[in-house]
Amino acid sequence: MGDVEKGKKIFVQKCAQCHTVEKGGKHKTGPNLHGLFGRKTGQAPGFSYTDANKNKGITWGEETLMEYLENPKKYIPGTKMIFAGIKKTGERADLIAYLKKATKE
């Protein structure tokens, strides 16, 4: 998997405007990501998801995030996440490594 420190920088640059990762963190434009791994799409308590997210029915893990983060709108058509995606596999791996650590602390 990727480099946690590099992944943290990517999160700060590309994700933190809309997401938090800490336990009890607030929802912003996007949901708080604490407990992300092993959770089904559209299930963060208290966040208003699109039906597309609620109905996707996959469980978040390294493989599903790798595919989703490349092109969110292709993976979940109808998502309200406006982020275009991260094309470089290495950058996605770094971000996922960071998320894996940060969302369970």
From Swiss-Prot:
Could you confirm whether the keyword Electron transport appears in this record?
yes
- Tell me the residues on which N-acetylglycine occurs: G2
Q: Which InterPro entries match?
A: Cyt_c-like_dom (IPR009056), Cyt_c-like_dom_sf (IPR036909), Cyt_c_1A/1B (IPR002327)
MF terms from GO for this chain are: electron transfer activity; heme binding; metal ion binding
The record's keywords, sorted A to Z, are:
Acetylation, Apoptosis, Electron transport, Heme, Iron, Metal-binding, Mitochondrion, Phosphoprotein, Respiratory chain, Transport
* Residues modified to N6-acetyllysine: K73, K100
Biological process according to GO? apoptotic process; mitochondrial electron transport, cytochrome c to oxygen; mitochondrial electron transport, ubiquinol to cytochrome c
Main location as per UniProt: mitochondrion
Q: What is the recorded post-translational modification?
A: Binds 1 heme c group covalently per subunit.
* Residue numbers binding heme c: C15, C18, H19, M81
Q: Name one GO cellular component term.
A: mitochondrial intermembrane space
Does the keyword Zinc feature in the UniProt annotation?
A: no
From the Swiss-Prot or TrEMBL record, state where the protein is found. Answer: Mitochondrion intermembrane space
| Any Pfam family the entry gives | Cytochrom_C
Q: Which residues carry this modification: Phosphotyrosine?
A: Y49, Y98
Modified positions (N6-succinyllysine) are: K56, K73
According to its UniProt record, which protein family does this protein belong to?
Answer: Belongs to the cytochrome c family.
Q: What does this protein do?
A: Electron carrier protein. The oxidized form of the cytochrome c heme group can accept an electron from the heme group of the cytochrome c1 subunit of cytochrome reductase. Cytochrome c then transfers this electron to the cytochrome oxidase complex, the final protein carrier in the mitochondrial electron-transport chain. Plays a role in apoptosis. Suppression of the anti-apoptotic members or activation of the pro-apoptotic members of the Bcl-2 family leads to altered mitochondrial membrane permeability resulting in release of cytochrome c into the cytosol. Binding of cytochrome c to Apaf-1 triggers the activation of caspase-9, which then accelerates apoptosis by activating other caspases.
- What protein am I looking at? Cytochrome c
| Organism for this UniProt entry | Canis lupus familiaris (Dog)
Q: What is the lineage of its organism?
A: Eukaryota, Metazoa, Chordata, Craniata, Vertebrata
Gene this protein is translated from: CYCS
